[in-house]
From Swiss-Prot:
Belongs to the asfivirus B175L family. The lineage of its organism: Viruses, Varidnaviria, Bamfordvirae, Nucleocytoviricota, Pokkesviricetes. It comes from African swine fever virus (isolate Pig/Kenya/KEN-50/1950). InterPro entries: Znf_MYM. Induction: Expressed in the late phase of the viral replicative cycle. GO terms for molecular function: zinc ion binding. Pfam families: zf-FCS (PF06467). This is Uncharacterized protein B175L. Keywords: Late protein.
Amino acid sequence: METNCPNILYLSGITIEECLQSKKTSTDALNTNGDEAEVEKKLPSVFTSVSKWVTYSSFKCWTCHLYFKTVPKFVPTYMRENERGEIEMGVLGNFCSFSCAASYIDLHYTEPKRWEARELLNMLYRFFTSQWISYIRPALSYTMRKEYGGKLSEEAFISELHTLEESISSKDIFI
């Protein structure tokens, strides 16, 4: 027997205004990131070099669920040499940072595929930064944000992501 109970979620300390402000902020970021032609553009399915890679994505990060203005990152699905002699990587996802891509791998892959995907992500990091690294720390879960019942404002969450991303090069250099 079905009941007609409304679906109500109560989040202590969160007001409707804060939820609406968060949605408005994300939408504003989308509308100011580029021209209208870019809005529907999807990421290429293949990566060959940083110089040929897209500089913008109109879609939210698959891990943190935020719009972003940084160069989109992805989870490499394979790496090989193509017929032109270029290194080619398969592209999965749309991520604002390497940490968000690492979180996606940790959540959705099992061993040994997880290890392989993490190694390819380290290689992708080298292509973008010219630095060898051994480990990329995963991003915080989006559920840490207030709008999902967590304790962090959107600004504090983004600040934590930036701190994680900056720590990659200073603490995880491959020797």
